[in-house]
Amino acid sequence: MRWGLRPRGPGAAALATARSLWGTPRLPCSPGWQGATKRLLVRSVSGASNHQPNSNSGRYRDTVLLPQTSFPMKLLGRQQPDTELEIQQKCGFSELYSWQRERKVKTEFCLHDGPPYANGDPHVGHALNKILKDIANRFHMMNGSKIHFVPGWDCHGLPIEIKVLSELGREAQNLSAMEIRKKARSFAKAAIEKQKSAFIRWGIMADWNNCYYTFDGKYEAKQLRTFYQMYDKGLVYRSYKPVFWSPSSRTALAEAELEYNPEHVSRSIYVKFPLLKPSPKLASLIDGSSPVSILVWTTQPWTIPANEAVCYMPESKYAVVKCSKSGDLYVLAADKVASVASTLETTFETISTLSGVDLENGTCSHPLIPDKASPLLPANHVTMAKGTGLVHTAPAHGMEDYGVASQHNLPMDCLVDEDGVFTDVAGPELQNKAVLEEGTDVVIKMLQTAKNLLKEEKLVHSYPYDWRTKKPVVIRASKQWFINITDIKTAAKELLKKVKFIPGSALNGMVEMMDRRPYWCISRQRVWGVPIPVFHHKTKDEYLINSQTTEHIVKLVEQHGSDIWWTLPPEQLLPKEVLSEVGGPDALEYVPGQDILDIWFDSGTSWSYVLPGPDQRADLYLEGKDQLGGWFQSSLLTSVAARKRAPYKTVIVHGFTLGEKGEKMSKSLGNVIHPDVVVNGGQDQSKEPPYGADVLRWWVADSNVFTEVAIGPSVLNAARDDISKLRNTLRFLLGNVADFNPETDSIPVNDMYVIDQYMLHLLQDLANKITELYKQYDFGKVVRLLRTFYTRELSNFYFSIIKDRLYCEKENDPKRRSCQTALVEILDVIVRSFAPILPHLAEEVFQHIPYIKEPKSVFRTGWISTSSIWKKPGLEEAVESACAMRDSFLGSIPGKNAAEYKVITVIEPGLLFEIIEMLQSEETSSTSQLNELMMASESTLLAQEPREMTADVIELKGKFLINLEGGDIREESSYKVIVMPTTKEKCPRCWKYTAESSDTLCPRCAEVVSGK
């Protein structure tokens, strides 16, 4: 117990006595028995007397001690969200973070908040993420750590800029860079306030007064220092390379800024590249009587004008075939002969085969420019999965193509401009035509005219789209700033071996994504972001960046923000005193660069600004699976590049939210769940009731977050029902300790009833398991373990058998105080166990605990504390063997009141008999612990069967395996349960069948009443 009222349990002597050598634990009333009977035996408490004496009738109503608490069983309608708001105010939710930061504790737990994007209303994905983080933080705080959790927002970038421009419409065309930036900042701030309010309403504990924002000048300055660190190490460079390019956004994009449309339709074509000069081997296989062409397939016809080569796989087999339709000879992969012939609706006769290496030194002519030669070149990226096994290569429009061109010094001319339109270099027929639309049409017609088009067909496949404009992208070479991640990747993968990933499979996913990444383009051609601190010469292809110029810019940004790049004149951005340090070039010869940094670099350097201490390493990063290629990766790469260490120790990856049937949420399907509606209810509250924040939190904790997470009305109703059952359990606990003071009324553990000691034993096991599950971040198992405990072990089992003791014994009777002592400990452990998940409910319960005089906050009183003296595995044998017999008894009287029967238990002499004697020392009793478990009129314990029995008895046989000293001693004992109707009458006070007549009290009640 951690209410701060008393030390727990007896001293060292009692502790030594408690160290019994008993068997392996089993759950209560588990079927650890084997038996045979003429009736069906059911594991249930059906048939048990589970009454609550009626205090509203009869002359004894004032003598019954019924539960007393103001804790409500249910909160209806607006009561739930309104109560939560009252609790947040009363219990100091807003002060909790600063309070715990001021504690003097040795350990610190740092969870680094991946910044959500500041461009919209809060959604259930936010709820899933923030609540998971809060559960982890609240547990670690209660468990003794100081929490470092600074929320942040990703404020720059294309999505915000596009949203602002789209809202402005035609007006946007006339805006200056600074006007766009001003409106983008205002938009981001508004989104941040909406999201922040929602996060606070959900009960998220954080440093809300000191959040980080990527548009803050101090943050931007840190980012620029990291950029220059990497530049100074030679890891950042400017180059002309193909990158993903969004014509709709007019900027380069990173892989993480793409989304793939599986329904994209491309126009795929089979194209002839006439053989110009055969390789020596190929020349020996053809006689020159028929035209020979290299056969190529592509899904991007618009790239054909930029072709510079055709690539083959050196190790593969190729075939020279004759086409039955045209008589022409074609060269293609031997494995593709049949499938390509079928596609072209013809037949191929194989003339000869050769190895890929035998194509070396061959050339073919460009299919649109006959005078231009395209060499045949080896390449490892060629596959046989689709196409012809020969790949058209346009260095300006493909990553692998660029690699081949670099190796063989091929031209890399780009024929496409920033708008995705052919330039004049492509020729008059193509100039000014959009490559993905009319440009493709014209290229195909040109191929037809040149008689080099064999087939065109539509292909539905996955294709990259701009994540914000939802329009297709192209690959286009341009001058950009890149990070050389080849060397960084090697070090990063080595460092990842020391990082714990949950689930473990996420590590492989992240490594695979890094391996597929040839380089990282970090420049963007927009204005809403952090400028790359580079100056370009007005007339020469030169740029200026060094430590002096960068540090000057960094200091300006730190003081005034990155707007200075667009507002200050060149002579202030490049003052003479700075230029004199580097040889004195004239500032007027240079202009500030127009590129800004990729937002993944923006957010990926957050570790440098947010993480505390010299190590600057977070204990935990926790984000959605999309961040394996996003923030997790950009944080790792920048951290490894700048300081050769990973920024995190543990990475948790959760899934995405879906509709409750597993479908994607969309307005058209009408299945979008808004967290504000979940918490506060919708317009029609009969259809969209206010669940409150705790239901949202329970949904998060109860979900298998490592896969996709479903949410919908039935899921939320199930969460509400779970919490309702938990409230009933808590109300029972609170109501039955109303007259109990732990300081004066507690019973020493060794003097408690066996069943009460047994519950403490189970409670300690529960506490240990829950603590370990929280440490493993397995919140779903925490919920399931708790739910099982409060429904099965408490409501269905323990509460049903102790009601008589609680309600009908004398107020200060040790038997009653014994179970109240257990109830206090149960209440303590249960409340602390769910507090990180349901903070509002935990605080509400805390305010209703009668023996806490000035309750403040359960979160300021620590984690679960149990005593080693509670651990009594030996008691399990007594209680569980009795439960096996009880199950047998109750199963024999389905639907009937157990209190109307008496039970004779016959056990052969041995260990089982001695164990059961712990529960009943006398031969027959209506008040023993055994009879309390049986819930019968009376219980008799015998070593041999009675000689005379009436004809209406039920005989049940069974066996119970006793396990002692960890399995060293095992003994199977037989028992018999004899059930017969009682001859006693119903007591008018306790309703047990223990009275001599229906109008007289049973002996126990007579004694209690006479003492009142």
Swiss-Prot record:
Reactions it catalyzes: tRNA(Ile) + L-isoleucine + ATP = L-isoleucyl-tRNA(Ile) + AMP + diphosphate
A Gene Ontology term for the protein's cellular component: mitochondrion
Effect of residue 859 to L: In CAGSSS; uncertain significance
Mutagenesis / variant outcome for changing residue 817 to H: In CAGSSS; uncertain significance
Placement of sequence motif 'HIGH' region: 116-126
Cellular localization per UniProt: Mitochondrion matrix
Transit peptide range per the UniProt entry: 1-48
One Gene Ontology biological process: mitochondrial translation
Binding site for ATP: 664, 667
InterPro entries noted in UniProt: aa-tRNA-synth_I_CS, aa-tRNA-synth_Ia, Anticodon_Ile_BEm, Ile-tRNA-ligase, Ile-tRNA-ligase_type1, Ile-tRNA_ligase, M/V/L/I-tRNA-synth_anticd-bd, Rossmann-like_a/b/a_fold
Record motif 'KMSKS' region, residues: 664-668
Effect of mutating residue 761 to R: In CAGSSS; uncertain significance
Modified residues (N6-acetyllysine): 74, 189, 233, 241, 725, 775, 781
Disease: Cataracts, growth hormone deficiency, sensory neuropathy, sensorineural hearing loss, and skeletal dysplasia: An autosomal recessive disorder characterized by cataracts, short-stature secondary to growth hormone deficiency, sensorineural hearing deficit, peripheral sensory neuropathy, skeletal dysplasia, scoliosis, and facial dysmorphism.
Its job: Aminoacyl-tRNA synthetase that catalyzes the specific attachment of isoleucine to its cognate tRNA (tRNA(Ile)).
Name the record gives this protein: Isoleucine--tRNA ligase, mitochondrial
Species, as recorded: Homo sapiens (Human)
Encoding gene (name): IARS2
